[in-house]
Amino acid sequence: MVQIKIKIKIKSMLVFIWNKLIDMKIQSLNRLTIIKDRFTKCFFKPPRIQSIDETLKKIIHDKASVARYGDGEFKLIHNLDITFQRADHLLSKRLKEILLSEDEKFLVCLPDVFQDLSKYADEPKDYWSLHTAKYRLKWYKDLKKGKIYYNSFISRFYYPFRDKSKCKEWFILLKLIWKDRDIVLIEGSKSRLGIGNDLFDNAKSIERILVPEEHAFLHYNKILTAAKKNNKSKLILLAIGPTATILAYDLYKEGYQAIDIGHVDIEYEWFLRQAKTKIKIENKYVCEAGAGQNVGDIQDEKYLSEIKAVIR
């Protein structure tokens, strides 16, 4: 019995040491990749990306539609699965197409991560430093040279930034987009944008179309059909992952103003709480904190009355 316990203990120690060695190897390779990228980026011109202020003001002034690209959309372009969306050939093709689009009132947004990263907090800084080191040249190959891109962080400007002093000002600007507008929120079934906070209190009216939290692109045609039943005077806000990028473009082509607003509600919740980490929000699906586990139903009458369609 004693010998068995000793063997188990030795085996556990060996597994621990092996895992540590693997971690050290991965960390060393990552550091080398980042060092190599410091030289690589000296020889390639980064994309031109407008600031958060410039992007928000452009949307307000021009009533522009918006598609936002990030690491998830990039991976899907290259047929890699992400947490809540399986790779799909058509999805990849459409994401590539829209990335290169040249429409006057359709803003294609990129993460502003291809130059100095010192403005970002430690976790996002480390993440983007490694991501760009691995994929910089692939990003540059996918983009259109000379095109003016806008800023994907228009709805993610609390958690990623080291200096959070401008967040209040940015949220004020953001809310001007839907001030006194009839809005349609197309969101995941447990995202519940604006519930429990005042994010959309200045909107004239709110309607909701609920879609599956994961793999929404499988239901794309049904989502598009439901969206097109709305009057074109309404502002359509999208929070359905990478599917929003394509939906925003297709709705724009049909004469709607459609904005991929992404994680804005969760960022706002973290801002209101002055959160230091990516915390769960009660009764809301947070992909990056808990991934929707233990998100219950709610019986808020106002919220339920706003739901006009449910896509399954």
Model-inferred region functions:
Residues 4-8:
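Ser/Thr/Pro-rich, intrinsically disordered low-complexity segments
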Residues 14-200:
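Electropositive, gly/pro-rich neighborhoods at or near active sites that engage anionic ligands
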Residues 182, 234-235:
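Structural motif
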Residues 182, 205, 257:
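Residues at the starts of beta-strands that form the adenosine-phosphate
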Residues 190-233:
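A mid-sequence, solvent-exposed acidic-amphipathic segment
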Residues 246-312:
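C-terminal functional extensions of proteins
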